[in-house]
Amino acid sequence: MPMTNLLLLIVPILIAMAFLMLTERKILGYMQLRKGPNIVGPYGLLQPFADAMKLFTKEPLKPSTSTITLYITAPTLALTIALLLWTPLPMPNPLVNLNLGLLFILATSSLAVYSILWSGWASNSNYALIGALRAVAQTISYEVTLAIILLSTLLMSGSFNLSTLVTTQEHLWLILPTWPLAMMWFISTLAETNRTPFDLTEGESELVSGFNIEYAAGPFALFFMAEYMNIIMMNTLTATIFLGATYNTHSPELYTTYFVTKALLLTSLFLWIRTAYPRFRYDQLMHLLWKNFLPLTLASLMWYISMPTTISSIPPQT
């Protein structure tokens, strides 16, 4: 039974990831006044499967100067972590109901840095190494604000459990009282997933493709799959934390429908930002975090800690 549950979680994620790639290419096409993929299958719907077939049947070339063990391990680790992050998410019931679900997500997403670092270093290429170092600095930096924003929201729910967060928002979405935090969270998730305007790691004009430049065929596809799964996961987490839907025990399907709709709308916002915004300069990226986001999130954390004390109560406890 646990194996069936695992497959029922993984297969829809893989399908969603495949069609997210197609949707992105279609949106990019229409925004640039062209069609996008429209040859394979009706309206190009089978394009992701054709791409997968092509990539996984090609020979995975390895640079002769690369460190083979890490070079092969890195993409596998990236995909494993991307799938592992989904286990505590309530949709409406999580695969594993962890008491410290949010802490687990934060800790596991930090491990994704290693796959990027290994791939950049093991490729033995200057472009890959510079891309990897940028990605690591960016990811570690933005995780600081993500953690502080999470702490602020947890002070309102009183638990690290994601299901409790959903219960907290039965009467009011957390995005309304904490909209500055929600805005900073959304921008930080863009940086965390290395998306435009923070895709410095894959700056085509500077680094060709970034940390995955030496990868081809299957391993290259694994990196792409991990990236798009992380995008969907981050938006799903955003929907859970700030746009929690009321869970009705009589109709769990309704919860799932609302929940997925919110996650899809947030994901489409990611794609729209990709088409509309130019890339940040690296110093601007770090300036935004350390000089703007960090002081603001720390100030808001102090506010959410002091408020219950000021009104002679304690934070909610569950």
Swiss-Prot record:
The keyword tRNA-binding does not apply. PROSITE patterns: COMPLEX1_ND1_1, COMPLEX1_ND1_2. One of its GO terms (biological process) is mitochondrial electron transport, NADH to ubiquinone. Its EC number is 7.1.1.2. It catalyses: a ubiquinone + NADH + 5 H(+)(in) = a ubiquinol + NAD(+) + 4 H(+)(out). It is found in: Mitochondrion inner membrane. GO terms for cellular component: mitochondrial inner membrane; respiratory chain complex I. Keywords: Electron transport, Membrane, Mitochondrion, Mitochondrion inner membrane, NAD, Respiratory chain, Translocase, Transmembrane, Transmembrane helix, Transport, Ubiquinone. It holds the Pfam family NADHdh. It is a multi-pass membrane protein. The chain crosses the membrane at residues 2-22, 68-88, 100-120, 146-166, 171-191, 213-233, 253-273, 285-305. GO terms for molecular function: NADH dehydrogenase (ubiquinone) activity. Belongs to the complex I subunit 1 family. Core subunit of the mitochondrial membrane respiratory chain NADH dehydrogenase (Complex I) which catalyzes electron transfer from NADH through the respiratory chain, using ubiquinone as an electron acceptor. Essential for the catalytic activity and assembly of complex I. Core subunit of respiratory chain NADH dehydrogenase (Complex I) which is composed of 45 different subunits. This is NADH-ubiquinone oxidoreductase chain 1. The gene is MT-ND1.
